[in-house]
Amino acid sequence: ALTYREMAERDSTHLNFILQYISECYSQMKDTENYVNTLREGFTRYPSFPFFYPRLIEYYQNCNMNDSAMAVTDKALKTDSTNINFMLTKSTLLLNRGDYAESLYYCYNILQKDSTVADTYYNIGLIYFNQAIEIDKVRQTSAAKKRQMENLYRQSLPYLEKYRAMAPEKKQRW
């Protein structure tokens, strides 16, 4: 299939699918460098095509290249700031690096657009839960900090319960 790559790429009408097939060939051949380069090219040319973005993000996260994942997500949001998948990924990346307020901002924007996105509830629950854990890690906490911690745990609970009800098959998360 790769033998005819140059000829196939001249078909601009179907180039998004051609780049998808080329990247899949590289993946099957375990040629990571060309696989990722083709994903990047595909995403650059077709940011809203559903194949390239999630695979690029998955690759970057598997390689612990979170800054690259964030950069791709920021580019994606510039092309479509209302795309729930892009917003959820941004929220998750922010959550993972501890930017809770900004992550929460994206979560609430998602819920305004679509309240059926289960992972949004999961992220909100984790935002509150993780903040409580951070307080709990401190050996000597004041009574006020303990109350704050308990309040954060309480705040997380309805979101995590909602996630559990919406995604009962994802037991490893709850």
Describe the function of each predicted region.
Residues 10-11, 45, 79, 113, ...:
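Structural marker of alpha-solenoid helical repeat scaffolds
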Residues 14-15, 49, 83, 117, ...:
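Residue-level recognition of tetratricopeptide repeat
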Residues 7-8, 41-42, 75-76, 109-110, ...:
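Canonical positions in the second alpha-helix
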Residues 21-22, 55-56, 90, 124, ...:
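Structural register within alpha-helical repeat arrays
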Residues 129-162:
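Short coil/linker segments at helix-helix boundaries
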Residues 29-30, 62-64, 96-98, 125, ...:
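Short coil/turn linking the two alpha-helices of tandem helical-hairpin repeats
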